[in-house]
C-alpha cells in the first residue's frame, strides 16, 4: 500500500508522515481498499491500517473471497532496536517507547480481528519471515 500511496501522492512515505500530509489517511484507505479487491497478489498494509473501520471491512471482504491474512509482529525490544529508539534523545521528545507500546497494543487488537495467523519476526531473518508467510499462505507445494 505504501508504494501505491507514494506513487499517487508523489512523495516518499516518510515525507508524507512527518509532514502530516492531509491526504495521507484517505489515500492509504483508498489504496488499501483497491488493492484488497484484486483477485491475486500480496498486499502489505501498514501496522495501523486495520484500525480504520473501512480498511478492516475491506480485509474481511478479501478473506471471504479466499485471501489469507498474515500479521507480521515483533516484540517491543525488536521494534525499538529496528527503529533506533535506544539512542539518547531529548527529554522534550517524551517517551517514544511508551507511545510505541500503546500503538503496538492497538494494532495487535485490530489484527486479532482480521488475521488468520501471526508470524513473529522478532528473531527471524527476512528469508525466514518469507518462508513462514509462504507456509501460512500455502503458496507452493513445498509448504
Predicted regions mapped to residue ranges:
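Short, flexible loop segments at the rims of nucleotide/cofactor-binding pockets, characterized by
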Residues: 19-23, 46-47, 94-98
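Short, flexible helix/strand-to-coil boundary loops that buttress conserved ligand/catalytic motifs
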Residues: 9, 17, 36, 63, ...
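K/E-rich alpha-helical interaction surfaces of small helical-bundle regulatory domains
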Residues: 14-22, 105-116
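NTP-dependent small-molecule kinase module
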Residues: 68, 108-143
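Glycine-rich phosphate-binding loop used to anchor ATP phosphates in small-molecule kinases
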Residues: 23-68, 72-73
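Short amphipathic alpha-helical segments
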Residues: 54-57, 81-84, 131
Amino acid at each position: 500500500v505504501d508504494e501505491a500511496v507514494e506513487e499517487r501522492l508523489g512523495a516518499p512515505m516518510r515525507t508524507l508522515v512527518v509532514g502530516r500530509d492531509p491526504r495521507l489517511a484517505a489515500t492509504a484507505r483508498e489504496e488499501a481498499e483497491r488493492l484488497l479487491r484484486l483477485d491475486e497478489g500480496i498486499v502489505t498494509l501498514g501496522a495501523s491500517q486495520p484500525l480504520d473501520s473501512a480498511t478492516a471491512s475491506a480485509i474481511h471482504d478479501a478473506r471471504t473471497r479466499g485471501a489469507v491474512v498474515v500479521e507480521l509482529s515483533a516484540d517491543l525490544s525488536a521494534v525499538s532496536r529496528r527503529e533506533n529508539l535506544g539512542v539518547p534523545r531529548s527529554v522534550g521528545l517524551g517517551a517514544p517507547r511508551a507511545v510505541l507500546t500503546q500503538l503496538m497494543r492497538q494494532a495487535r487488537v485490530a489484527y486479532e480481528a482480521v488475521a488468520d495467523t501471526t508470524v513473529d519476526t522478532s528473531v527471524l531473518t527476512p528469508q525466514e519471515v518469507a518462508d513462514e508467510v509462504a507456509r501460512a499462505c500455502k503458496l507452493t507445494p513445498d509448504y
